[in-house]
Amino acid sequence: MKKRTRRPSNPIWIAFLVLAIVAMIYFNQVVVPDMPTFFSPSATPTRSQESLVNEAQSYFTQGKLSQSISSYEQAVRADPRNPAIFIELARTQIFAGLYQEAVTNAENALLLNPTNSMAYAIKASALDYLGNYADAELAVNKAIELDPNNASAYAYYTEILLDQGNYEDIQTAIDISQKAQALDPNALETHRARGYVLFNTGNYPEAIQEYQAAIAINDKLWDLHYSLGAVYKMQGEADLAVQEMLTGVALNPTNPDILTEISRTYASEGQYGKAIQYAEQALSLDPSSPRLHGNLGVMLYQNDNYSKAVDQLKLVVNGGTTSDGVIVEGMPLAPGRIADDYYSIYALSLTQLDRCADAIPIMQVILTNIATDQVAYYNATQGMDYCRTSSGTPSAGVTPTP
């Protein structure tokens, strides 16, 4: 009998096996030992992973994200070698705003299965929320490479592109969202991505339909109500906007962003008293946030309370310590809301207090460094003209560009 010739070793395959073995050794020696034991030894029988996963899914459906996360973590401890549980845990953590933790658990899933498309997709979404857009794109493209039919990956890719603010190539985001829709038209992530792209293209009625469809799948997720409220606001339906955002607050009462958007919604309707109320509530949740001090300062300015506006806005521009001893770090000048609202409104507030000597240097910084920001440039120019004509004496006041 002729002896069969052995096939020559494939160096690429050998390298892959070596990497896989290294990953498993790392996971067994580093990741698994680091997981705390949930149950102490007792006569009580250990719950099955299936039972814990079912419980986690039930909590998720109810919008009880912290309980869902806890159950998934227990399921991981019951079987730390199941990548699917790490993926579901990471997905839930994203909805709960625990983005760095989500990245970690998506990577844990990849240690167990380096070719898992969904693990890459979830990691990409978490990185997007962290503002790490370059790595998010790398991860989501890897997810699509591994599984070109992964609808969630296309949905996340849509959001990553839009979050970068590059609207010159918005057609790419539209096309990718339509790809997600073609692959899985009924998925929550698909509806959310389509709603987001329709919102950013000004198609508000269609965006509302998509967010409503997502909410019909799970009406206990705060970010869906928040997003729907934002669309209603842009469509001029302030009452519906506030209603949806308050639902978001009920589901996530510790998130200051929702309260901040409610304050801006009321301000857009000229209801500055309510705007200040919600801005103060938002600030109470995170008193060290310069952004929240800035939002409150803008609301106070719009309500003609210039002295209190200055107290808040100077913390944004210069940093400092609040009356309660909370340290606030200043925000460097940058185009957009920081310049348009915080810096220029701070300068305009100073002019209304006959403090042009303090206001002019701020306006000069704006005019010198970010003259391309049309809103900030206009506000600074108006303030400079006011100071020149009034010699620091307030009269009719200065109205900033909205």
Model segments located where?
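Long, contiguous interaction/recruitment modules in multidomain scaffold/adaptor proteins
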Residues: 1-47, 138-141, 145-156, 182-185
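Structural signature of tandem alpha-helical TPR/SEL1-like repeats
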Residues: 63-70, 96-108, 130-142, 164-179, ...
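Structural marker of alpha-solenoid helical repeat scaffolds
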Residues: 78, 112, 146, 183, ...
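Helix-start (N-cap) detector for alpha-helical repeat units in TPR-like alpha-solenoids
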Residues: 49, 83-84, 117-118, 151-152, ...
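Position-specific recognition of the canonical hydrophobic site in helix A of tetratricopeptide repeat
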Residues: 60, 87, 94, 121, ...
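Alpha-helical segment of the N-proximal tetratricopeptide repeat
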Residues: 45-84, 88-98, 163-166, 189, ...
